[in-house]
Amino acid sequence: MQKKSSEEKFWDWFSDYSQKISAVEDLSDARLHKLLDPLSKYLHDYCEGLVFEIGYDKETRTFELVISADGNKALFPAVERLVYAASPVRQWKITAFRQPKGRNYTIEYNGYHFDSDKVFFIPINNADNSVPIDIEVVYPDYKEENRNTFLGGTFLLLDALLGEKCTELDLAYINVSKQPDTVGDCKYYSLSMLKSYLDSRKKQID
């Protein structure tokens, strides 16, 4: 008998265990958090560094398990191998990587409000229309002492706008700074336009 792969072993376990999670339809239920601890352990046993998110669609009564590399590009192959090997699980949708949440997105992070329509980026060294690109994300209220907050909020916005994989593969360098009073020949775009900006560059490459 052929030995099962680590991916198959994971899905064999999850196929049975998922029924316990499916019985709790309220994602805020304290019982659910306790049920997710074994899932975290089994996922880390498969590949340390992988994380997951759970979603639930009340209309279709379907759960979603998102397997994520948490932005670590080196772990992308492990995510893809695991999700590709997934067998159908009743009431569950299995997804690789955090997906885009739409063109417009707002978050509150460490006391700051981040709105993709009101945050702007400047492409850096973009003359050759290649991908990945470097971007400078600028804020009128940027303060250097709060740099980590601005960086954290920026990455959360990018993850929501582009999805995990696109953020890592299509953006080579990301910096945050104060928006200058005059921009000269620089072109500003709102972060809400970033995905379409990247898509247009990819079409030029093709």
Model-identified regions with their sequence ranges:
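Long, contiguous binding/interaction regions
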Residues: 1-62, 71-206
